């Protein structure tokens, strides 16, 4: 699906986003979490609206053609935007395979990566991460007190592809393994991010209906499974 976004052939200085939507939603009865609807919009629609404030294209990483077909009706609401799909080629490799497939599909040097069940991704924070990553290998949020990270809410350069291949060759699939193998990663402290998003809703993901209720209040009767 393409639109007004003008991207030259090959790699450009544009910004891409990779949305990892291939999860099976086991904790929600195998539903497509990206299609959960509350307050009149699906999670995917909310996510795309936020991302397109700061990126030129979005790549949806999905598991197969049937899942792609389920998501297509949402994409029809974005006729003038560049949205493409990519598919895993390795089975049971987790989100790292989705990132690999997305980076291969991306037309940009830098891509923001997030999960498909994150309805409140903050475009200002995505913009901040792109600015921090510029000229480096990646920009990764870090919880400074306990040294934990947000690898599925980060900006990565194409340099990560080589490290991902090395990770798979070593029979590992942790997202942080190739991140730490890169030499020039910028860590963005959560305290700085909190200055933009005090409640840190940008990191929130949906695993259960209760998660939605806790984030936006009672939505009983509004959630369509």
Swiss-Prot record:
Name of the gene encoding the protein in the UniProt record: mobA
Q: SUPFAM superfamilies attached here?
A: Nucleotide-diphospho-sugar transferases
Residues annotated for Mg(2+) binding in this entry:
117
Q: Which Gene3D superfamilies match?
A: Spore Coat Polysaccharide Biosynthesis Protein SpsA, Chain A (3.90.550.10)
Show the CDD domains listed in the entry.
MobA
- Domain comment text? The N-terminal domain determines nucleotide recognition and specific binding, while the C-terminal domain determines the specific binding to the target protein.
**Which reactions fall under this protein's catalytic activity?**
Mo-molybdopterin + GTP + H(+) = Mo-molybdopterin guanine dinucleotide + diphosphate
According to its UniProt record, this protein's enzyme class is transferase
Tell me the HAMAP family matching this sequence.
MobA
Family to which this protein belongs: Belongs to the MobA family.
GO CC, alphabetical: cytoplasm
Instruction: Look up the domain of life of the source.
Output: Archaea
PANTHER family documented for this protein? MOLYBDENUM COFACTOR GUANYLYLTRANSFERASE
> What does the record list as GO biological process?
Mo-molybdopterin cofactor biosynthetic process
Q: Which UniProt keywords apply?
A: Cytoplasm, GTP-binding, Magnesium, Metal-binding, Molybdenum cofactor biosynthesis, Nucleotide-binding, Transferase
State its cofactor. Mg(2+)
Q: Where in the cell is it found?
A: Cytoplasm
Q: Which InterPro entries match?
A: MobA-like_NTP_Trfase, Molybde_CF_guanTrfase, Nucleotide-diphossugar_trans
Function description: Transfers a GMP moiety from GTP to Mo-molybdopterin (Mo-MPT) cofactor (Moco or molybdenum cofactor) to form Mo-molybdopterin guanine dinucleotide (Mo-MGD) cofactor.
Q: What is this protein called?
A: Probable molybdenum cofactor guanylyltransferase
Extract the GO molecular function terms from the UniProt entry: GTP binding; metal ion binding; molybdenum cofactor guanylyltransferase activity; nucleotidyltransferase activity
Q: Where does GTP bind?
A: 20-22, 33, 88, 117
């Amino acid at each position: 699906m393409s639109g007004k976004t003008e991207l030259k052939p090959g790699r450009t200085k544009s910004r891409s986003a990779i949305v990892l939507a291939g999860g099976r939603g086991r904790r929600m009865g195998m539903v497509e979490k990206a299609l959960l609807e509350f307050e009149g919009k699906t999670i995917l629609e909310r996510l795309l609206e936020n991302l397109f404030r700061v990126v030129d294209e979005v790549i949806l990483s999905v598991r197969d053609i049937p899942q792609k077909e389920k998501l297509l009706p949402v994409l029809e609401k974005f006729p003038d935007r560049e949205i493409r799909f990519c598919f895993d080629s390795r089975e049971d490799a987790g989100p790292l395979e989705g990132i690999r497939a997305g980076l291969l599909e991306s037309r940009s040097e830098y891509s923001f990566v997030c999960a498909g069940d994150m309805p409140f991704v903050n475009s200002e924070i995505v913009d901040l991460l792109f600015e921090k990553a510029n000229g480096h290998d990646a920009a990764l949020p870090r919880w400074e007190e306990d040294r934990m990270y947000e690898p599925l809410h980060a900006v990565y350069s194409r340099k990560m592809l080589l490290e991902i291949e090395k990770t798979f060759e070593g029979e590992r699939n942790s997202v942080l393994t190739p991140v730490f193998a890169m030499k020039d990663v910028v860590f963005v402290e959560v305290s700085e991010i909190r200055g933009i998003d005090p409640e840190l809703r940008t990191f929130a993901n949906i695993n259960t209906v209760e998660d939605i209720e806790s984030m936006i209040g009672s939505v009983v009767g509004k959630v369509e499974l």
